């Protein structure tokens, strides 16, 4: 599934074994020197040091420009005090995170260097390189994360953000990852955060951090508690509105946050690795490539359907992997149809188009029905129809290995328009003029309408009824039942 507003590198990872005699949930040892702003026995998000750090970071944000700098010298005295509160809090909290010791020490150094620079554009590369959460994928292990960064689907400015989170890594995922290797993949649960994460952002990617250069082949994290919570909220409302009789497995997910979190971990783990697997006609990460947005729709949907296909096969197992594989199939289907299709603006909404495409494909193949204002599925026939769409996208990719880039774009458009109706004013639908066809790829992209494939009447009506529900999921966590 896409979790981005702009194309981003997908990532892969493998857990590192931690010695058995290490506490799985680090606490402050009773015999260490006490620090007034860290109190033993309190949960992390209630620690005074965390609350001080969170308040200081939040107060610092209005002083920062979009690039993270603080240009007004008149704000520097206040900024120095706030940064001092941040670094003091990090040092006080560090004993709670022994696995992140090198990172937290480097973070203090980066903050001090930023102050010494006169609050120029921040450079937190050193602390980012020291932060390696993929090396400690242990269920429940906490992390303290503090960086100047933008948050995807959240803040567009590189402001100082702080968050507390913990790892989601159940035993069945550790077993699954031995086959579906994803060595830099990190799954997390949000505990508390600054305003940049009180949004729709559900990812933590290194490339969002303010730094002098972007490291290569690095980790990536997804907050599955947020994904699961908004799935449960949205699907509950949408199924009531559409009078959908939910299958028992899907109904279980709506009443069980942890079950749904684990299901999303499985989906995301397989999805992420799929970006660089298969017969691919182009750079699977699509880095720095400007192209029509419907190509991103197909790529994200391809990876979701690859996960769906894998889970159809795994669903025959009689164990935790099999149980969750059957639930992933519902998650892909309902998240794509009920949330993706009607979330966000209609400006080059590639995730939205993927949901529209899946719905229309299933409807046109007679396995999804909207009759007498009630939604229904022929569940026995759904897997074959979904896999048929996956096959169609895979076929497009395989054939395009032998095509020029813009010819691939044209073929991709034909696949999408064969299922979803384009805008009546579309140049692509009428046929691009000769000067565009003979020109540079930029002309092709410029000719795509912002809303090249408008919502159908079904989705227009559903969006109006679901608008408030979806809007209310901004900032949601697994605790918000």
Residue ranges, per PLM feature:
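Post-HEXXH active-site segment of zinc metalloproteases
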Residues: 279-301
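Contiguous, non-catalytic segments that form substrate-binding/exosite surfaces or channel walls
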Residues: 91-251
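Short pre-active-site segment immediately N-terminal to the catalytic Zn-binding motif
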Residues: 251-267
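An active-site-proximal "capping" alpha-helix that borders the catalytic cofactor pocket
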Residues: 296-312
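Active-site recognition of the HExxH zinc-binding catalytic motif
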Residues: 267-280
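Extended, compositionally biased alpha-helical segments that mediate assembly or anchoring
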Residues: 7, 40-151, 160-162, 403-481
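Long, well-structured alpha-helical subdomains associated
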Residues: 40, 261, 308, 312-423, ...
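Long, intrinsically disordered low-complexity tandem-repeat segments
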Residues: 20-38
């Amino acid at each position: 599934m896409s979790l981005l507003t702009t194309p981003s590198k997908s990532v892969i990872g493998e857990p590192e074994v931690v010695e058995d005699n290490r506490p799985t949930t680090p606490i402050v040892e009773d015999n260490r020197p006490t620090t007034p702003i860290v109190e033993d026995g309190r949960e992390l998000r209630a620690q005074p040091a965390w609350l001080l750090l969170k308040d200081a970071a939040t107060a610092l944000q209005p002083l920062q420009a979009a690039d993270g700098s603080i240009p007004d010298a008149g704000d520097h005295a206040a900024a120095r005090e706030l940064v001092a509160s941040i670094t003091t809090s990090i040092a006080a909290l560090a004993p709670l995170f022994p696995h992140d010791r090198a990172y937290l020490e480097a973070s203090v150094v980066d903050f001090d260097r930023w102050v010494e620079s006169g609050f120029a554009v921040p450079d937190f590369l050193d602390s980012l390189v020291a932060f390696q959460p993929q090396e400690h994928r242990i269920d429940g292990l906490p992390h303290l994360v503090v960086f100047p960064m933008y948050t995807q689907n959240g803040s567009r400015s590189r402001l100082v953000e702080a968050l507390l989170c913990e790892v989601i890594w159940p035993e069945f995922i550790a077993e699954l990852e031995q086959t579906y290797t994803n060595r830099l993949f990190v799954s997390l649960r949000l505990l508390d955060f600054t305003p940049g994460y009180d949004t729709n952002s559900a990812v933590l990617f290194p490339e969002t951090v303010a730094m002098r250069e972007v490291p290569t082949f690095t980790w990536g994290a997804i907050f599955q508690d947020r994904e699961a919570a908004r799935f449960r909220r949205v699907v509950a409302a949408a199924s009531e509105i559409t009078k959908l009789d939910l299958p028992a497995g899907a109904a279980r997910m709506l009443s069980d946050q942890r079950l749904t979190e684990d299901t999303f971990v499985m989906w995301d783990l397989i999805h992420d690795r799929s970006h660089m697997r298969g017969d691919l006609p182009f750079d699977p990460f699509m880095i720095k490539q400007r192209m029509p947005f419907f190509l991103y729709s197909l790529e994200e949907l391809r990876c979701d359907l690859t996960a769906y296909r894998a889970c159809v096969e795994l669903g025959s197992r009689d164990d935790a992997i099999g149980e969750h594989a059957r639930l992933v199939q519902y998650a892909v289907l309902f998240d794509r149809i009920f949330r993706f299709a009607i979330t966000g603006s209609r400006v080059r909404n590639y995730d939205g188009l993927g949901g529209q495409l899946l719905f229309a494909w299933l409807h046109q193949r007679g396995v999804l029905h909207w009759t007498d204002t009630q939604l229904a599925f022929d569940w026995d026939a759904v897997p074959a129809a979904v896999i048929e769409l996956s096959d169609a996208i895979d076929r497009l990719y395989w054939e395009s290995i032998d095509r020029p880039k813009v010819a691939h774009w044209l073929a991709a458009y034909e696949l999408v328009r064969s299922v979803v109706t384009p805008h009546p004013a579309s140049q692509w639908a009428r046929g691009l003029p000769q000067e565009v066809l003979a020109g540079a790829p930029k002309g092709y992209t410029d000719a795509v309408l912002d809303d090249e494939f408008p919502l159908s009447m079904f989705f227009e009506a559903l969006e109006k009824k679901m608008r408030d529900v979806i809007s209310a999921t901004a900032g949601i966590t697994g605790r918000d039942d």
